[in-house]
């Protein structure tokens, strides 16, 4: 079937699902495959549950003479092509966002600001891979005038591929840091892969929003059409931090002589300052009133274990347990060290996907903790356990929870950070 004909079926269906447990009436089911499942096997169930059509790539799962089955060579590839075709047909302005740290928070901040004046489609959660990006694009409607598309990667070439699907008209890289070194091979590999967004934008002479204070980004920005933000006075948007205990507060202005704005956020961490400036920059570029920009930033509440502050009966928790890498871990520790709060405690989990660099990177974190004045330090995971230190260590989060059930700390401000696979977020209910 030609893509144009398949697109007409998609338009008639209005929505797409890849989950046979979630089949809105009249939707289009796409049979994707995973390590432990084959979506083709659930095509009949999807049709029985209300889907109007099912795209499959294994003919044996089709029911003879049932025209609702659409056979293609590769379901995932078809989904990606369909998403790109849909994006082109609508012509919605697309902002592409990637980076090592903060891309999901920045995407949320940008979307919160833009929604003050525009009808915006944006990536839900962190659906930012080869499946998540087309899934988001297929949600585009004619009424959307902007789309904010998050793009993630853990191997070279992935951002280039996602750019070919989303075809961003504007772009931003939040930062580059030491993450997924196992897949990228080196920090230079991270920079090169994230820079694939710049390569795409450069060819289109598209607008690129850039953090002017970041030397790694500036070094690869040659030939780009730049709009800059940072701390220097003459930038499109510039500002400085005014508070950080515990919430981030800052002031900003547009250009050298712009009106000074004060913003108090509900975000934890000085590392979120550039993310907020990025949202202001993009909001200003797309014509959002400054009062509405400030309001959106002040009212944004972080979710999903990212820079969240939670007060329990016993302690104050800074929950940043969605993910961790050497760059984000060090930034979180430096921020926590600078906070003027009493009785600081750390519960840190291993940083995963670092490959051969893992022992050295964990040791660097441990050495920094040794130099700092934290009252209690608990380290979770085999990499931290193998480092040279005398801090309390746990093999896994279950051991931590067992200790907490017997004798929980009280009166502490506790930073909780580690790779998502360590599952440190499960300690929260016991603190």
Q: Residue locations for each model-derived region?
A:
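N-terminal leader/targeting and accessory segments in enzymes
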Residues: 1-81, 85, 338-339, 367-381, ...
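Acidic, Mg2+-coordinating active-site environments of NTP-dependent enzymes
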Residues: 3, 60-65, 172-316, 341-342, ...
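Residue-level signal for inorganic ion chemistry
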Residues: 27, 46, 82, 97, ...
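Active-site beta-alpha connecting loops in nucleotide-dependent enzymes
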Residues: 34-37, 302-305, 322-391, 419
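Phosphate-binding loop of NTP-binding sites
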Residues: 78-212, 216-224, 283, 402, ...
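ATP-dependent carboxylate/acyl-activation modules
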Residues: 97, 304-306, 421, 425-426
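Peripheral docking tails and interdomain loops at the edges
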Residues: 393, 412-429
